[in-house]
From Swiss-Prot:
Origin species: Protochlamydia amoebophila (strain UWE25)
Function: One of the primary rRNA binding proteins. Required for association of the 30S and 50S subunits to form the 70S ribosome, for tRNA binding and peptide bond formation. It has been suggested to have peptidyltransferase activity; this is somewhat controversial. Makes several contacts with the 16S rRNA in the 70S ribosome.
Homology family: Belongs to the universal ribosomal protein uL2 family.
GO biological process: cytoplasmic translation
Protein name: Large ribosomal subunit protein uL2
InterPro entries xrefs: NA-bd_OB-fold, Rib_uL2_dom2, Ribosomal_uL2, Ribosomal_uL2_bac/org-type, Ribosomal_uL2_C, Ribosomal_uL2_CS, Ribosomal_uL2_dom3, Ribosomal_uL2_RNA-bd_dom
Amino acid sequence: MFKKYRPVTPGTRQLALPTNEQLTRPCENSRATVKPTKSLLLPKRRTNGRNNNGHITCRHKGGGHKQHYRIVDFKRDKENIPAKVASIEYDPNRTAYIALLNYADGEKRYILAPQGLKAGDKVQTSDEPPFHIGCCMKLRLMPLGSVIHNIELYPGKGGKLVRSAGLSAQLMARSGGYATIRMPSGEVRMINENCRATFGAVSNPERNLRVEGKAGRMRWKGIRPTVRGTAMNPVDHPHGGGEGKHKGNTPQTPWGLYTKGLVTRSNKKSNKLIVKRRRKK
């Protein structure tokens, strides 16, 4: 659900923000959500897109509100111990929501919250049913056609694929020690069937409908302005300079690399595991 604000100021004219109804609140009528668990927080130091030499390696980053990093369990390696979902919480470091699990042995962990998971639900990592949303299992034990997320690339290394808000993959087939997965991009690839994945799609599927409404809200997120190349000088960009508005050459990055369709992915050994590329040839 989204709230569209009345245009009482220029900043609220286009503003559309989520109501975050899935998040857990301390009481029924409270607007505030529950506070994060302190034992699962780490201090986060901003690099603002600079490397160890101070050079900009990622443009358009800088400033933003202070944040704590939430320690999220992507491995889901606590086997055969049931856990109860204590709360669904906001995480400023990722697009999806996170869920706080209270395990039967007393340990607490954060996981990525799938769609439909709510406080009070039971989840666990095991080799047996139930095949419920939020439960984790090896690919070789999952029913074909399952909708999954947080998929490992190598057994025991933790989930690397399908972790952003609203995404999901589908288990298509199994053969020769590999599971065939259809990715959100349309790519079909094989993954070791001993890798783990979690049932369900990632939470917060309507995130792409969010409208910030003003530049200042982007600055709160640590996102700086993006300047067009044609508005620069020739020393700053291949599109810069000239008399009046004109592009005059092939679309390029600031470093002269052709863009708009050029494949930049390097060949890797894992190419043989890709059954169908996401791009149609």
